[in-house]
Regions:
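Non-catalytic DNA-recognition/assembly elements of restriction-modification systems
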Residues: 1-34, 162, 166-174, 181-206
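Sequence-specific dsDNA recognition surfaces
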Residues: 24-40, 54-84
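Cleft-lining beta-strand/loop regions that shape enzyme active-site pockets
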Residues: 51
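Short, ligand-facing micro-motifs at secondary-structure edges
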Residues: 57-68, 87-111, 127-131, 140-146, ...
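A short glycine-rich beta-alpha junction/loop motif
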Residues: 108-116, 124-127, 147-174
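Short loop segments at secondary-structure junctions
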Residues: 120-124, 137
Length: 206
């Protein structure tokens, strides 16, 4: 998070003077779905994945309680067919403003009415947009938008489209994402070493 601010500044104040555009300009799709008829009773053990707000956490996807629907139900949600690298944003409820990228392995998938799909054009990298949306400053902005409407804790499609997004050069966006990936690899390596040390310790104690 500190690296984001270090490289790009505050994305809300845009104190680095980057080009700024409404999110609707740099995306090919913004939209949310619906809950299939029958609600929870319509969910299945397998089939097409239905992403709900409980699955979307900041920077990570939660697989617990992942719902599935039939092909017939999925066809009724063909306006929200997920694609690889789509950015997810919770737009209603207590988890409003949480955002992550859809994992490829759960596709084919749809979203319900509480989750918004954001599909990026080539000028903005999905991973960069996700990091921007979950930046502390941007989270505060999203919460204030969600709390200002007639319906509490909700962000409309129109409000998502109008969100002002900083647009640094793609090369710089890529550089930042490469840095994040290296950090993630380091974390995995450290955890593996800790696990191995614990196993060794446990075997010595026996």
């Amino acid at each position: 998070k500190a690296r984001f601010v270090e490289m790009f500044g505050n994305p809300v104040l845009n104190d680095r003077g980057w080009k700024q555009v409404p999110l609707g300009v740099v995306t090919t799709k913004i939209g949310s779905g619906a809950t299939p008829k029958g609600g929870k009773g319509a969910y299945q053990e397998s089939g097409v994945t239905l992403i709900r707000s409980m699955n979307v956490h900041n920077g990570r996807f939660e697989y617990k309680e992942l719902a599935h629907i039939s092909d017939e139900q999925a066809r009724k949600l063909d306006n929200v067919v997920m694609e690889e690298k789509d950015v997810l944003l919770n737009i209603t409820g207590a988890s409003v403003a949480r955002s992550c990228i859809v994992p490829t392995e759960i596709l084919p998938a749809r979203v319900n009415q509480h989750v918004c799909i954001i599909r990026c054009k080539e000028c903005i990298i999905p991973e960069f947009l996700n990091k921007l949306l979950i930046d502390d400053n941007y989270q505060k902005l999203l919460w204030s938008i969600a709390g200002s409407g007639a319906t509490r804790e909700a962000i409309t499609k129109q409000q998502v489209e109008k969100l002002q997004i900083i647009l640094p050069p793609v090369k710089l966006q890529n550089k930042y994402i490469e840095f994040c990936n290296q950090i993630d690899k380091s974390k995995v390596a450290v955890q593996k070493a800790l696990d191995e040390a614990q196993l060794l310790f446990d075997s010595l104690m026996q």
